[in-house]
């Protein structure tokens, strides 16, 4: 795959990725090269790859528990799934992407980087995808759609007590208020906004967290990973 030069990893990257820092750096070069070449990333994003994209996704790993199965819906160039897999090698990430060229990029990328992820081509709402993936502990997404649509796609992939993590922007609180009722109707409740990685990225990653089914209270108390 084509590589391109990127700014050196910031100091925070070593703290977030640890021994996987070199793989994270390789992923950044792939995004800047093949990712831009194939239209998965805008060329203007290369200079801010680390803070805006890679680290912003990776810090969400603090909301994961060891051994969890994590589905990334609408994975695109692998964000947030690949940074999460690098930062949290103790979880298993499934990258779900409907477009052929993007799913091929994902397969080539994880093979070159050398990480244990699965790639499933299809839409999260497709029955074939649901049958292949089964139920997961966490469904994560980034800049894919509005919360009501994300809930409709995420909920069938979540086990009872599982969590939906939607990486959002500064209007996340307003969006939660707008869609809370629709999310509850689909079985996702106790919706809240978390800020992650404030010690590593500025601004912190903003994540909408929702819980699936009746086991949500006990899950919410143990869901955050302690560093």
UniProtKB/Swiss-Prot annotation:
Kindly give the InterPro entries that the UniProt entry links to this protein. rRNA_ssu_MeTfrase_G, SAM-dependent_MTases_sf
Judging by the UniProt lineage, the source's domain of life is: Bacteria
Question: Keywords, A to Z?
Answer: Cytoplasm, Methyltransferase, rRNA processing, S-adenosyl-L-methionine, Transferase
Q: Name one GO cellular component term.
A: cytosol
- Which residues of this UniProt protein bind S-adenosyl-L-methionine? 74, 79, 124-125, 142
The UniProt entry, under Gene3D superfamilies, shows: Vaccinia Virus protein VP39 (3.40.50.150)
Q: Does the keyword Transcription apply?
A: no
Q: What is its EC number?
A: 2.1.1.-
Q: What SUPFAM superfamilies does this protein's entry cite?
A: S-adenosyl-L-methionine-dependent methyltransferases
A GO molecular function term, named singly, is:
rRNA (guanine-N7-)-methyltransferase activity
Question: Where does the record place it?
Answer: Cytoplasm
Keyword presence, Cytoplasm? yes
Report the sequence similarity comment from the record. Belongs to the methyltransferase superfamily. RNA methyltransferase RsmG family.
NCBIfam families, sorted: rsmG_gidB
Q: What does the UniProt function comment say about this protein?
A: Specifically methylates the N7 position of guanine in position 518 of 16S rRNA.
Q: What is this protein called?
A: Ribosomal RNA small subunit methyltransferase G
Gene giving rise to this polypeptide: rsmG
């Amino acid at each position: 795959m084509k590589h391109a030069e990127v700014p050196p990893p910031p100091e925070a990257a070593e703290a977030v990725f640890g021994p996987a820092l070199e793989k994270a750096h390789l992923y950044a070069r792939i995004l800047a090269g093949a990712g831009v070449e194939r239209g998965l990333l805008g060329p203007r994003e290369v200079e801010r790859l680390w803070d805006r994209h890679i680290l912003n996704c990776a810090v969400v790993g603090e909301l994961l528990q060891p051994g969890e199965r994590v589905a990334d819906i609408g994975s695109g160039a692998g964000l947030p799934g690949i940074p999460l897999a690098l930062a949290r090698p103790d979880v298993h990430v499934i990258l779900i992407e409907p477009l052929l060229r993007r799913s091929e990029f994902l397969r080539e990328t994880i093979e070159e980087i050398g990480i244990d992820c699965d790639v499933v081509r299809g839409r999260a709402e497709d029955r074939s995808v649901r049958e292949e993936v089964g139920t997961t502990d966490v469904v994560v997404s980034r800049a894919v759609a509005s919360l009501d649509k994300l809930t409709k796609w995420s909920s069938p992939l979540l086990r009872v007590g599982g969590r939906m993590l939607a990486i959002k922007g500064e209007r996340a609180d307003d969006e939660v208020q707008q869609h809370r009722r629709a999310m509850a109707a689909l079985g996702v409740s106790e919706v809240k906004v978390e800020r992650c990685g404030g010690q590593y990225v500025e601004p912190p990653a903003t994540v909408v967290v929702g819980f699936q089914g009746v086991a949500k209270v006990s899950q919410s108390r143990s869901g955050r990973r302690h560093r």
